[in-house]
Amino acid sequence: MLIALFALAHLPIFRKTPLSASSSPPPSVHRSPRCGKASTAYHPPPADACISITASAIDAASGMSNSAEQDKPIAANGNAAEPQEIEVIHFQAQEKQCCRVIRSNKTKVLTSGGVHTRGSSKVKLKNIVDYKWERKYYYPGHLVAVHRDGKHLAYAINVNNKATGMEGMVRVCNIATSMRALIKGMSGEVLDLQFAHTDCERILAVIDVSSLFVYKVDQIEGNLLCNLVLKVEDPIANYVPEYDMVSWCPYVCSSSATVPINDDDDENQLLIWSRSSQFQCFQVKMIVSEHGRGKIQPAALESGYLKIEEDSLITCAALSPDGTTVAAACADGLVRFYQIYLFDVRNHRCLHEWKPHDGKKVCSLFFLDNINKPVEESYWQHVITTSDANTEIKLWNCSLWKCLQTINVVASPSSLQPRNFIAGIDRSANYLVLSCLDSLAVYVMQIGSTGGADSENRSSDSEGEGCDTSKRIQNVAEFKLSSGILSFSIVNASMRRVKNSIESYYPIEEPDDFDDDSNSTSALVLHMFVVQAKSLQECQIIYQPCVAEKTERSSLNSKRSQTPEDNLLIKEEPESPNSGTVGAVQLDALFAKSAKRASTGSSSAMVAVAAAAAAAPSAILQDATKEAAKSESPQLSSAYTQQVNLMTPDAFSASGTAAAAAVFVSTSTTTSIGTDSSTTTSGQDRSIDSAVLQTIRMLATVTSKTSENPNAEVLLNLMNNTLIEDREQQKLKEKLDARKKFIAIDRNPERNVAENLASGSSSPSREVQEIMATQDDADAYEAELENLDDDDDDEEEELANSSPLPEAVDGTWPIVKLSSHSAELQNAAQIMSQAVQNTNNGNVPPTLGGGHNNNTSVGSNSNNNTATTLSTSNTSSSNNAGGTCVDSSGTGELNAKMELLIDLVKAQSKQINKLENEVNKLQKQQEAAAALHSKQDTSLEPKNLSQLAYKIEMQLSKLMEQYLKRYENEHKKKLTEFLAARESQNRELRDSVLQVLNQYVMNHFTDIIGNVLNMELQRQLLPRVNANMDQLQAQMQVEIVQKLSVFDKTVKENIAQVCKSKQFLDTFGKSVLIGVQTSLQTAFIESMSSTLIPAYEKSSQNMFKQLHDAFSVGIKDFMVQFNTYLQHMPQPQAGSGNTEEINNKLSMLKQLVESSLHKHRTELTDAMLETQREVKSLEILLARQVQETIRAELRKHMEAQNVAMRSQAATPAPPYDLRDSIKQLLMAGQINKAFHQALLANDLGLVEFTLRHTDSNQAFAPEGCRLEQKVLLSLIQQISADMTNHNELKQRYLNEALLAINMADPITREHAPKVLTELYRNCQQFIKNSPKNSQFSNVRLLMKAIITYRDQLK
């Protein structure tokens, strides 16, 4: 009762406030939106959501718009606020409120912690496919794509193939007919897939690492067929996919076009493929018409194709709906807009370039164009960009290239890891959806348009001024999930009629399911398909979005009409200045007869205001009448609507599961103010409580004697003036804060614990328990405060719309009616006390009369009827108070209480009908009496009237004080009893909760703790351990490498010192000599016996055989000649003459034999010398072979020794490189040895290497050639072996080598002819094959020199 007195003392009718002070509510007062209380740090003063009076009309009516208020900065949403302040929206983990209004241009959204174990009841999930996808935070594209019809679905899967490794596939299915098809042939993982935005055809684009596939999905004879239309192969070398994506053009033809929309338009089949630092545009229809279906290379395309290279990695790309512009965002933060022209692959132009996020990488880019229907405006006027893993969201105006709004999504302070979000937008571009794998939540942001009327209220620094319409993110909603989302695809999002229950909504699928009497309301239905770690699910999010109080109904209607599925609006009719008809009214506001929660404060607040109005002094009303008369002008006439929430008896009998739920009826009434108004509307737009209306009518009767009938109407209409209502409602709300604290005793913290232990699904028993529970939450109380203000306005509207009661004939009429009014005042006080009591008790308030009846004007009533109604209400209230505690096993008792409650409501309804009939009769009698009294002289002296009014006021005040004191004492008693009952109830509930909690902990604590520990170990401990292990491994590797390098250096130094010591060299030489001696002797003996001796024996044998043959043949010839000579010689004569002749001949024979012997001796000597020279050459060759053999053996032993020594140091032996050895020899000046080693390798590349690194002047010095003859011959042979690569260097060395040949050397004379013949043949081949070579003339000169040398060697 103290709260009621406090509220009565601060009502508007007890204060004399100037009219100018009520033109606007105080800027510090914040009204909570209909969806609930937002815990925000920034509270700009909202304008009334139902007032549509222009600023000029308000200035004319109030006359108080000063320059100080006009100069205040105004935010983009029309609110006076500091532009530098940032609005903070914090979603709590356990709160029920899911949607928050965004009022500022800079907003920070704090997400919940993501520690919940169950999802929101507003999210409906239906399992489609069970498949395990890899759980990772970022996929470059979409894992699932849905066609525009919402029936055909495609999702990517990976199959491990033993032959080819991981193979990507795409499953296409029709969820309506359960037909499926599988697409194969992708190399590696499927990176992205998208359906084209067409209605008739189903065209699917799929990309992998190096290829683009376009398939056409057809349904033929009950089978789903996927036919390949186009395959573009364009691999990039050494490319690792990071931001690969494919996107179709969301083409929408102009609304002014006369040709209907055709799915075969070229723009419908335009797609963009972005990857690495390039993106490619393909016109599929044009390419197929020119090149046919199948594989194609981009290089072969001359039209229908465009490729653009960027400077850095492309993170995202999007096509405008008109198909003429593509926007590409890069990793360096730049976004470029290109104009595309597909008939020329080299023709493209950059339209604009800008950095939307100050150089930060742009993650997503969305054009805010409704692709569901044509529009009048040009496209891509607004765009949304995101950065920082889609946590920073900016809304841009592309006409001015300025930012309209910025929203930062920040993880809650309890979160340890930053959030990585994935983003998507629906086809109407009205809803932006964000999801995070860690937070286990989905965030929906509603994007709306602000019309030209709002543009007047924008600030001068608003980025969207100058445009007729501007986009704005109006609210954000958070929905918890049981598991995170890897990828999603949105089907559509629209406002629909849904069936509502206590905690959730269900969409009405068929039109026959809906009727005006069904339990339904209008809500947003977001339909999409989501991919989770273990399944693919169909998801529906159903909720009622928040609307800021300043947002007008017209803007909401225009925004909601953008979706083609939403046809639940009534078009706005034009209003005349003096008309009182209702404007654009939403059907969800007119026919939403129920809400999901009970409100315990609306009826009680309404009764409190009505009872307070009963004590209004008439003098104050007269002052208000004079001020209202001053503001009358033709320019002031305007219509406004006021939406209120009233509690009806239907709330207690609507359904079985929610029998005691409080139900609101959203109505709209319109009042016209003007000078030409002479009559008021007699019909009522909604039902009014009889007791409240009687009290207000009594005030109207008291004040009717002081003025004429039109002035009384103006006085009553003044009560509905919104300029006064706003200020008074705000002050009343401030005073009711104390009441909020007083009612706070109704909070029961144990209820949240019980709810958390309950199942996530909705059950009838749980809903009944929540309905009949005694505690109240913060959302219901906020709704109570709103309804209190709205009911006050609506009661005054009823007073304004009702006709005034007739006056009394003489002065005794007020005295006769005084007792009746006293009884009515007593009844009003009882109702007010009962409302306060019910509010404190947390019960559903009693429903007053007239909850169902419309168009009814209730006059005065008899005391008996009023007492009967009040007794019924008290009985209902007591029954409700007795049934607040519902035991889990008391279902029968609950049903009995429900039936009793329904019976009481029926009885009350019957009594209300009777009262209405009696009121109608009384009204007719009063009208007749008024007609009779009007004929008589009704003039009363002003003095008697003022005295009468003063007496009535005094009596009413005294009676009110008496009744308030009496009911205050009763209320204290009842409150004491209630607190005792409440304490016992809390004690029982606490015991039951503890028992249930203990049992639950004993049964599930181990499993839950195990799961939580495993999850936390994987999420928290494992990454940190891995990071520390990686650091430790890196440190160990660095230390090991350092230590190994130091150890290697030390070992090398020690080995070098040991090898250089004389003792080691002596020991090593002895050991090598001992080890090699036997092998060398054996090799020497074998070489002598197998090579030298046989060759010498063979040559000697041949020589002696030739000598024997020569002597034998010579002697035989001599004997033959000698015999012949003897035969021809004459017979010897006797005497001395013959003897002398014989002696002469013998002497001649002797000389001849001696000469022959001398000749043969000379030849034999020459042969022996030749043999000796050959033996010497063989000795030289043998000695060299023995030296090489010894060196090879020594080298092998040295290498074996080095390997053994290095193996002890645990380091690998360095590879032996001939080029390094040759370089060392050349640097040491051992040119012959270097060439010898290079020629022994039989590697022409090594020979060329030696030629390049040797100075020819040093090798062929003037004092003599430093190369041996065998080295020269080998060099000539190997250089001439490959004349195809002959060059100047080789030619120079050939010339020098030929000049250095020593013809006297036996080795040269033996082998030079063969080498020169081969060189001559190769030169001939070179001249034949390369006649135009630069070395042609030099080779010819070389050939002449070869001929000269060959002649010398012959």
UniProtKB/Swiss-Prot annotation:
Keywords: Coiled coil, Cytoplasm, Phosphoprotein, Repeat, WD repeat. The keyword Cell membrane does not apply. Residues 554-565 have a biased composition (Polar residues). Signal peptide: none annotated. WD repeats lie at residues 309-348, 363-406. Gene3D superfamilies: 6.10.140.270, conserved c-terminal region of ge- 1, YVTN repeat-like/Quinoprotein amine dehydrogenase. The keyword Metal-binding does not apply. It is found in: Cytoplasm, P-body. One of its GO terms (cellular component) is P-body. Residues 853-884 have a biased composition (Low complexity). Residues 18-38, 552-581, 788-811, 838-884 are annotated as: Disordered. One of its GO terms (biological process) is deadenylation-independent decapping of nuclear-transcribed mRNA. InterPro entries: EDC4-like, EDC4_C, EDC4_C_sf, EDC4_WD40, WD40/YVTN_repeat-like_dom_sf, WD40_repeat_dom_sf, WD40_rpt. Its main location: cytoplasm. The modification Phosphoserine is found at S32, S561, S576, S759, S762, S763, S1207. Residues 788-799 have a biased composition (Acidic residues). The modification Phosphotyrosine is found at Y1320. Residues 765-803, 893-936, 969-1036, 1159-1188 form a coiled coil. It comes from the Eukaryota. The modification Phosphothreonine is found at T563, T581, T1211, T1317. In the process of mRNA degradation, seems to play a role in mRNA decapping. Required for silencing a subset of endogenous miRNA targets. Homodimer. Interacts with Dcp1 and Dcp2. Interacts with Gyf. PANTHER family: ENHANCER OF MRNA-DECAPPING PROTEIN 4. Belongs to the WD repeat EDC4 family. This is Enhancer of mRNA-decapping protein 4 homolog. The gene is Ge-1.
